[in-house]
Amino acid sequence: MNTRPEQASKDTSGLTLQVALQRQDFRLEIDLELAGHGITALFGPSGSGKTTALRVLAGLEPAAQGRVCVQGDMWQDSAQGVFKPVHQRALGYVFQEASLFDHLNVQENLQYGFKRTPASERFRNWDHTLDLLGIAHLLKRWPHELSGGERQRVAIARALAASPRLLLLDEPMAALDAPRKAEILPYLERLQSRLEIPVIYVTHAIDEVARLADQLVLLEAGQVTAHGPTAELLTRLDLPLAHGDSAGAVLHCSVVSHDEADHLTLTRFAGIDLVVPRQNAAVGQTLRVRVAARDASLTLQRQTDTSILNILPASVLALSADGPGQVMVALEVGGSALLARITARSAHTLGLVPGLAVYAQIKGVAILG
């Protein structure tokens, strides 16, 4: 096995996807430049082209026209007659159902992926991969002995064992129940921070997007309707994600201190303090915090006789109708964006207009990781 220290990928120029594919009455058109690391989520309704986009990246749609370049390696350039078939593309592909070899145990499944790559092209450390997915204790087990979450972790590890330059995850949690999703999510979070290759993650679950994705691509009927940082797109009132009961903002907060007596942790984002339930996190560590729009209320004056701990100075950016009698308010707080879903009557009573200074009262937060 390769036990030498893991090396960074040979090129960090990122991923270029400029392609078009016509299928009867459906047309996929994508023009994207993506970062060379981190998780990019493809999000959209069924039939929007998410899985088709992955298939184009993998070389499974030879009819697609355009360019695919991954970390400086041109996989497809139709104008130049370049098209590498799937077996010549250094990628890992994980589907909804973990496709493990039932006649091989976990270690043998991983060795299959490991041996696919010539020794000279291996940069993925074997032990690092086991640690990343937390599967060292599973090596002698057979696929039928694994839970759904364990099977997916092994499938991802097998894909990584081949030292891919790109990892494609096609709704890897769609077939899992809630407990198994909770089991695998912390390991998927590790991919976000510890892999030096781009990860393209297809999902239709907004909670997965909020927790995992650095960048977000919205697809509708084969077209890219928006692309950018996840935190930004989740709070744009011109996009559907910023509306409805599931709307909310994602903040990246640094741990400042812990209050052991009251079981609280003080965090800070953009110079703004945010108190959260006690976290097992080191001072200086960054936490991903989600504030649901339904958990934010607004006042014109700072309240002192309240049980709410987080009362943040804010200014109104924009307002948008959000269902019968409801208004979604976009707020700026220390340069970051928040959402508050309030009644239309409250918005009228407070006289909310863009630029108005208010206080956002945060009733609760969710620590995503």
UniProtKB/Swiss-Prot annotation:
Q: What is the purpose of this protein? A: Part of the ABC transporter complex ModABC involved in molybdenum import. Responsible for energy coupling to the transport system.
Which named protein is this? Molybdenum import ATP-binding protein ModC
Residue ranges of every copy of the ABC transporter domain listed in the record:
3-246
Topology versus the membrane, per the UniProt entry?
Peripheral membrane protein
Is this entry keyworded Membrane?
yes
User: Subunit structure, per the record?
Assistant: The complex is composed of two ATP-binding proteins (ModC), two transmembrane proteins (ModB) and a solute-binding protein (ModA).
SMART domains, A to Z: AAA
Q: What is its main location?
A: membrane
Record-level GO cellular component terms: plasma membrane
Q: Which InterPro entries does this one have?
A: AAA+_ATPase, ABC_transporter-like_ATP-bd, ABC_transporter-like_CS, Mo/tungstate-bd_C_term_dom, ModC_ABC_ATP-bd, Molybdenum_import_ModC, Mop_domain, P-loop_NTPase
* Entry's family note: Belongs to the ABC transporter superfamily. Molybdate importer (TC 3.A.1.8) family.
> Which molecular function terms from Gene Ontology are attached?
ABC-type molybdate transporter activity; ATP binding; ATP hydrolysis activity
- Name the gene: modC
Q: Mop domain location, by residue?
A: 305-369
| Pfam families attached to this UniProt entry | ABC_tran (PF00005), TOBE (PF03459)
Can you state which reaction this protein catalyses?
molybdate(out) + ATP + H2O = molybdate(in) + ADP + phosphate + H(+)
Location of this chain's protein in the cell: Cell inner membrane
The entry marks the following residues as binding ATP, namely G44, P45, S46, G47, S48, G49, K50, T51
| Native source organism of the sequence | Albidiferax ferrireducens (strain ATCC BAA-621 / DSM 15236 / T118) (Rhodoferax ferrireducens)
Regions that span the bilayer: none
Q: Give the domain of life.
A: Bacteria
EC number per UniProt:
7.3.2.5
